[in-house]
Regions:
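Small beta-barrel nucleic-acid-binding modules, primarily SNase/OB-fold domains
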Residues: 1-120
Length: 120
């Protein structure tokens, strides 16, 4: 994951519309000049437990990760650093609140594990 500016990556202000789960959010990206783009963003570099599963223990951890993310993003100004698109066509991004890398913080707080895009 990236802590500082990385060449070739773009930063955007985003409006979080919905937290899908602990590693996926729906946002509106401010492209500037009053142009917005709505999309689903997969948080790059992390994997959170599934919140929609029959495994009750994983579901419990997944719902906790989702709630933790809601608590960190709701009512805050959020920025996103784009990392292109992933293998399923979703935008990949890192989220920041007041300069804090939320993706990284999720791993540090135990709500997600590091993930490089391979098999889980």
């Amino acid at each position: 994951m990236t802590e500082n500016y990385t060449e070739g990556m773009f930063y955007y202000k985003v409006e979080v519309l919905r937290i899908v789960d602990g590693d996926t959010v729906d946002v509106r990206i401010d492209l500037g000049f009053n142009v917005w783009h709505k999309c689903r963003v997969r948080l790059v570099g992390i994997n959170a437990p599934e919140s929609r599963t029959r495994d009750l223990e994983e579901k419990k951890r997944g719902l906790a990760a989702k709630q933790w993310l809601i608590d960190r993003l709701e009512f805050h100004d959020v920025e996103m650093q784009s990392h292109g698109t992933g293998k399923y066509g979703r935008v990949l991004g890192e989220l920041f609140v007041e300069g804090v890398n939320i993706n990284q913080l999720m791993v540090e707080k135990g709500h997600a594990t590091e993930y490089d895009g391979g098999k889980r």
